[in-house]
Amino acid sequence: MAQSHSSSINYFGSANKVVYEGKDSTNPLAFKYYNPQEVIGGKTLKEHLRFSIAYWHTFTADGTDVFGAATMQRPWDHYKGMDLAKMRVEAAFEMFEKLDAPFFAFHDRDIAPEGSTLKETNQNLDMIMGMIKDYMRNSGVKLLWNTANMFTNPRFVHGAATSCNADVFAYAAAQVKKGLETAKELGAENYVFWGGREGYETLLNTDLKFELDNLARFMHMAVDYAKEIGYTGQFLIEPKPKEPTTHQYDTDAATTIAFLKQYGLDNHFKLNLEANHATLAGHTFEHELRMARVHGLLGSVDANQGHPLLGWDTDEFPTDLYSTTLAMYEILQNGGLGSGGLNFDAKVRRSSFEPDDLIYAHIAGMDAFARGLKVAHKLIEDRVFEDVIQHRYRSFTEGIGLEIIEGRANFHTLEQYALNHKSIKNESGRQEKLKAILNQYILEV
């Protein structure tokens, strides 16, 4: 990586550049499993994993929750307004360099404050965007994706593209227009649409079909404008079932895929899937990844984990090796994520308030996914599950099963077969055996 842009302040004083020291290292500021240059399956770990740091949780979050005030100690937070925005850029690129992180991601309002008018807001964005572009040029760090924050400001109380207020729809369009221009200017490899407040609380005051139609209209406008300005990055949509609204329109992978297909958007969008959102939807993360993968719509990942005992978006750093292994299994089976990556949409706990906790947390997440990648690659290489699945469905490779697959069977022929074939014998699914094998691979690979 090229030498970084200089900064007058050392924001992460006790942390040097994080390097790989191996699994026997006791240094908390070293990678134990993530060796960026290690080659697995013909690609380096850095190429496989495409790690990205989320600007919002890392540099703007202050630890405020519904029960208490801010707790985070950040060397840059005594600044205000645009000065604060500039200091955050310096801190961000210092951290990217220390972690050798190849990508980052942001909402528009993460990097620059809103002004008193849309024009002033865009001027603020332009100023910080110029600074970021300079740092990107000097560091080699790239923008994985950007998006528009259309949920914080009170104007979006009823939603953005699904708002009942046409003035809000227009403002949201202007904001995404600027976001797409930002994406092109900074070379974003993707542009994300997250539902924010695109949903509803009660059907008593909601025209559901009208709102879905408007959401689709909005996205088609975005597709058209991207073509107009020559932005060729991948469009991504991020499912979430609830929070902040009771019923989010992009509930889960299946619902979102149905929406994209219904409105003719599936050739323009892929899915950005978040582990914690899968938990909120009552799914495993690997279920969501598989659902997107089999439809050819797996685009990128927000890497985090939810707390199984809590019913809200906790956005914890991913440390569950079962989850990272099964996630990487799906990603490898997908042939990778293309222009997507693993973006750490995760925040340190409110009680982990020192700057170095940000470094520890990202090391933990990067190591967890590196370990998951290695185990998943070995599982695929050894055909541990593939052979089991192939054997399990073998009845469809011959006889009546093959007739079904080839379209030669119908209800009449199948009824005749069932009448003549009096004995049905099922075989065990061996679920416990397979879980034991998975344990063995996680522990020994």
From Swiss-Prot:
Any one of the GO BP annotations: D-xylose metabolic process
Compartments (UniProt record): Cytoplasm
UniProt cross-references to HAMAP family, sorted A to Z: Xylose_isom_A
Cofactor field: Mg(2+)
Species in which this protein is naturally found: Bacillus subtilis (strain 168)
Reaction equation(s) it catalyzes: alpha-D-xylose = alpha-D-xylulofuranose
EC number: 5.3.1.5
Binding site for Mg(2+) 1: E238, E274, D302, D345
PANTHER family reported for this sequence: PTHR48408, XYLOSE ISOMERASE
Record-level Gene Ontology MF annotations: hydroxypyruvate isomerase activity; magnesium ion binding; xylose isomerase activity
Protein name: Xylose isomerase
Major localization class: cytoplasm
Keyword annotations from UniProtKB, A to Z: Carbohydrate metabolism, Cytoplasm, Isomerase, Magnesium, Metal-binding, Xylose metabolism
GO cellular component, one term: cytoplasm
Residues reported to bind Mg(2+) 2: E274, H277, D313, D315
Family: Belongs to the xylose isomerase family.
UniProt subunit comment: Homotetramer.
Highest taxon in the source lineage: Bacteria
Cofactor note: Binds 2 magnesium ions per subunit.
Active site positions, chain numbering: H107, D110
NCBIfam families: PRK05474.1, xylose_isom_A
Top EC class, one word: isomerase
SUPFAM superfamilies in UniProt: Xylose isomerase-like (SSF51658)
